[in-house]
């Protein structure tokens, strides 16, 4: 790497040769006068012919400076000049007249092709050449003088211009593999049908990985897809260190690749063997709304509509970018996008109108299960918080009481809960547009129109399918479609009701149309291909163009003026209660009862007066627990556990609740988080070990009380309270409890209804989207119906377009959401049946009511409502069974039994040898006896036991910490422990170990 300052005496301008990259044969130049710099460089063309690239002020000027510039890997020089420079007269450079490096074996090119010097040849030539400032040709030709001091490249170009190469050198050229930029025409991947050499393709990285092989080799594989097809790309590296240069290749990145296409013996298909790779130019969809006064979209569907594809963040970001004063969210029959939309609206500063496209039926049906219900679409928009709560109530009623294949809304119900809501006439499926389509009289149309706050018209493409419907024989041309919209506008004027132009957007941009075709193909009948309307979000200009058949003033009125007026009537509201406030249920005297039971239990265990360490820990925990309103949560957990204990079942606590001493004293967990200690159950003599010399209380040796001779209890696992509720004790407690699976879990669920009231307890709802494998099947069905053939990589690319769209709803297996008695559930969420199944069948086949869940996914409201995790688990059930069989109390089993502990390092206590175990198992862990022990029986954990040979309970706890999480043990703690650098107790096994 060399740096020089070059001055042109003739022009008086200064050009700075910022860097000479000897690896890439590139010059990076900064100049005040670009034109003068170009003249100087052109005068130097003979001397700089060996360079690959020349960058001037960040631009590649290679071709401009020297059109015949030779670059490694590309024989661009005329044959005579190339031969003179690098031919037979040069003993260091060979020539191959028959084939290029990229040509397949046995094939000859029609024209002689010269083999170019290797990069090492060029590097050696540069190294052997005299310094640039000593070359007379430069000063004689261009009148250039040199000085060695100049500013660094970093001081001239922004940091974003640099890419770190594998060798640690900064590069600005985007080259990922190879020595130069890729030249040549880019081919569509779909054109690759046979083996060929030197092909160039560009596409999106669908997935990539670098797999280590034997003998330090490495195989890089990449799934690449463009807009036509996909192909697997490979690159072998003799040294895995050389593969580091491709660590910058990531999923969804755009890359350009050159290589040879060959039939791969492993995959059986064509594979592109990579010779060069660089970052490609991503084809971004970049639509803009340039209108001075933009419109408002009042009809839009997110992925929560079964047929919608609009991503929540994409629509809010786009609306903000387009400076739309508001955007409405109106999914089909649901409002499940609201929680995330609220967060995104705050993030982007975008006003959102919260609404829904409902299914209107004329009257309350006598038989809701009738298949003959005629429904119409209707838009509901919330104007204020009252309207929002009424919208929630309508959603609940439509899902719980009036659900028949879809959530229906009887007209009387809409009248009852109209306060705070605006009703729009919706699309071609709305009752008003249907009446227009059917040719109803003006009087009837005006009567229908007066039910709505505004009428809708949409682009002709949305309704173009009417041209092909036999039952609408009168609709034959686009002009007929225009007349339908004109009729809506006419009736709106007569009735004094504003008319608004809406997109009925189901996908964001026109380029996403194929994604929706793929999504809807799942409902196509085999062999029947359906076309779908272009229901994408229009810009203001596009919408005005859609209604250009109207007078300009009228088009602007329905597209801009009226939509903005509707938006102005809707306040800025938040669908959920304030994010920072948690509404916990109230139980009279819960705080006092919790405090009293804790001190009572502490005195029972440790005597009175309480030791200072006990008093301090109780004060540390009880103060923030009560001050932050969490006392009731502890008390509820205490009641649930006690109810199960009284029935003879143990309850297992999960997660970090064991770090709370208050939870221990309240009987919520049997884990004691105090420092390891002895305590006498008779006279309360105690001894605490706070110097870290003991890993846990269960590791202490058996000992009798020095005061009274009673066998001492041993306890304490030294867990800080901050692990559970944070350093300030302000984290919402997450108390997960394992109840005995089967009867006891069901009883615990029933007991919550007794505690809080049946009408205040609901199962936590979940929302399931289309998963990758299902989306893959959608694409295959789409292709098969159309007689298309896609390879798996291209299918994987297309499936990403439909993945994540809502598929169904469900319930958390253990989550219970509790609404305070003095609050309405509709302050938080609507309700529905899980998977919309109003009726289920029990084991006998009898019909039983379905499970009522929250309409919103429980994650979005768990910080606002109390969520109880009442899990069913086999362990408490098995422990109870063993207690019944043996008569041994599980709470009095010793944790330092020598034979039991020996199982984690040897099978001898089982009465079998390692050889017998090896014959039976035949894999790792043959020298330990843990194969039948839960959490320790897998080959991975048995291998850990062989490496560590744990000797006590606290070491077993650390093993469990090491075995959970990515790279906690492998490539981390294992290497440190087996190399002897640290002892097991010194390695980080859990977050508790990371303390200052």
Predicted regions and their residues:
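Intrinsically disordered, low-complexity basic tails and flexible linkers associated
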Residues: 1-162, 166-168
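Extended low-complexity intrinsically disordered regions
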Residues: 579-626
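Helix-rich "cap/lid" substructures immediately adjacent to catalytic or cofactor-binding pockets
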Residues: 608-652
């Amino acid at each position: 790497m060399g740096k020089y300052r070059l001055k042109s005496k003739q022009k008086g301008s200064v050009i700075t040769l910022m860097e000479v990259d000897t690896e890439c044969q590139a010059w990076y130049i900064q100049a005040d006068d670009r034109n003068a710099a170009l003249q100087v460089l052109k005068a130097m063309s003979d001397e700089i012919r060996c360079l690959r690239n020349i960058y001037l002020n960040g631009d590649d000027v290679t071709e401009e400076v020297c059109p015949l510039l030779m670059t490694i890997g590309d024989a661009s020089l005329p044959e005579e000049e190339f031969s003179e420079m690098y031919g037979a007269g040069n003993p260091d450079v060979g020539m191959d007249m028959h084939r290029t490096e990229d040509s397949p074996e046995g094939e000859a090119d029609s024209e002689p092709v010269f083999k170019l010097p290797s990069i090492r040849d060029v590097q050696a030539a540069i190294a052997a050449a005299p310094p640039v400032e000593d070359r007379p040709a430069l000063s004689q030709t261009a009148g250039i003088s040199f000085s060695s001091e100049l500013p660094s490249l970093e001081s001239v170009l922004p940091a974003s211009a640099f890419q770190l190469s594998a060798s640690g050198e900064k590069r600005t050229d985007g080259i990922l593999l190879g020595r130069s930029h890729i030249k040549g025409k880019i081919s569509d991947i779909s054109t690759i049908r046979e083996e060929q050499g030197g092909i160039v393709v560009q596409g999106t990285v669908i997935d990539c990985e670098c797999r280590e092989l034997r003998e330090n080799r490495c195989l890089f594989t990449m799934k690449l897809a463009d807009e036509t097809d996909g192909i697997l790309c490979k690159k072998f590296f003799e040294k895995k260190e050389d593969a580091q240069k491709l660590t910058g290749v990531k999923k969804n990145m755009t890359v350009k690749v050159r290589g040879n296409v060959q039939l791969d013996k492993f995959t059986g298909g064509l594979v592109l063997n990579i010779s060069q790779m660089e970052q490609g130019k991503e084809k971004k969809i970049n639509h803009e709304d340039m209108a001075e006064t933009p419109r408002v979209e009042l009809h839009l569907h997110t992925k929560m509509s079964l047929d919608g594809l609009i991503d929540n963040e994409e629509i809010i970001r786009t609306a903000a970018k387009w400076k739309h004063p508001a955007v409405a969210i109106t999914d089909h029959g649901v409002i499940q996008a609201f929680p995330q939309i609220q967060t995104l609206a705050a993030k982007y500063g975008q006003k959102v109108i919260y609404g829904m496209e409902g299914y209107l039926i004329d009257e309350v049906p006598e038989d809701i299960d009738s298949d003959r219900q005629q429904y119409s679409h209707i838009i509901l928009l919330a104007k204020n918080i009252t309207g929002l709560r009424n919208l929630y109530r309508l959603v609940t009623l439509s899902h719980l009481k009036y659900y028949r294949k879809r959530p229906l809304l009887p007209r009387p119900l809409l009248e009852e809960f109209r306060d705070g809501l605006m009703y729009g006439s919706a699309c071609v499926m709305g009752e008003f547009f249907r009446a227009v389509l059917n040719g109803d009289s003006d009087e009837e149309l005006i009567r229908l129109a007066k039910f709505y706050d505004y009428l809708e018209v949409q682009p002709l493409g949305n309704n173009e399918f009417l041209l092909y419907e036999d039952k609408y024989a009168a609709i034959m041309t686009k002009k007929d479609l225009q007349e339908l919209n004109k009729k809506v506008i006419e009736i709106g004027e007569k009735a004094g009701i504003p008319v608004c132009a809406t997109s009925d957007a189901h996908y964001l941009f026109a380029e996403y149309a194929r994604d929706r075709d793929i999504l809807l193909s799942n409902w196509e009948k085999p062999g029947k291909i359906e076309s779908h309307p272009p229901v994408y979000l229009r810009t203001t200009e596009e919408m005005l163009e859609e209604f250009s058949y109207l007078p300009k003033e009228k088009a602007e009125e329905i597209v801009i003026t009226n939509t903005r007026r509707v938006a102005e009537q809707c306040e800025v509201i938040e669908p959920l209660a304030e994010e920072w406030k948690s509404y916990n249920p109230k139980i009279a005297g819960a705080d006092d009862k919790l405090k009293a039971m804790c001190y009572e239990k502490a005195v029972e265990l440790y005597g009175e007066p309480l030791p200072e360490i006990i008093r301090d820990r109780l004060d540390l925990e009880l103060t923030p627990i009560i001050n932050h309103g969490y006392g009731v949560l502890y008390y509820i957990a205490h009641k649930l556990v006690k109810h199960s204990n009284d029935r003879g079942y143990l309850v297992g606590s999960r997660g970090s609740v064991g770090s709370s001493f208050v939870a221990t004293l309240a009987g919520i967990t049997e884990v004691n988080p105090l420092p390891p200690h002895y305590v006498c159950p008779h006279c309360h003599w105690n001894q605490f070990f706070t110097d870290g010399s003991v890993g846990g209380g269960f590791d202490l040796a058996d000992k009798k009380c020095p005061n009274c001779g009673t066998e001492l209890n041993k306890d304490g696992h030294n867990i800080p309270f901050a692990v559970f509720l944070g350093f300030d004790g302000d984290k919402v407690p997450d108390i997960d409890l394992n109840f005995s699976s089967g009867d006891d879990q069901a009883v615990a669920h029933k007991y919550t209804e007794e505690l809080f009231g049946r009408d205040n307890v609901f199962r936590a709802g979940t929302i399931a989207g289309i998963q990758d494998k299902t989306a893959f099947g959608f694409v295959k069905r789409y292709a098969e119906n159309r007689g298309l053939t896609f390879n798996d990589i291209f299918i994987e690319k297309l499936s990403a377009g439909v993945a994540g769209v809502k598929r169904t709803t469900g319930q958390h297996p253990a989550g219970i959401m509790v609404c305070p008695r003095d609050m309405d559930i509709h302050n938080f969420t609507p309700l529905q049946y899980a998977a919309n199944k109003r009726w289920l069948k029990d084991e006998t086949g009898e019909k039983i009511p379905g499970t009522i869940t929250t309409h919103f996914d429980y994650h979005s409201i768990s910080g606002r409502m109390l969520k109880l995790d009442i899990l069913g688990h086999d362990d408490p059930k098995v422990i109870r069974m063993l207690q019944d069989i043996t008569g041994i109390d599980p709470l009095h089993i010793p944790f330092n039994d020598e034979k039991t502990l020996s199982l984690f390092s040897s099978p001898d206590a089982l009465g079998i040898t390692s050889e017998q175990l090896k014959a039976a198992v035949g894999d790792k862990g043959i020298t330990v006896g843990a194969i039948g022990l839960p959490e320790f029986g897998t080959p991975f954990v048995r291998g850990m036991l062989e490496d560590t040979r744990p000797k006590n309970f606290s070491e077993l706890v650390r093993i469990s910490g090491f075995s959970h999480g990515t790279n906690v043990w492998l490539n981390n703690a294992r290497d440190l422990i087996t190399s002897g650098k640290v002892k097991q107790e010194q390695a980080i096994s859990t977050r508790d170990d990371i303390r200052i």
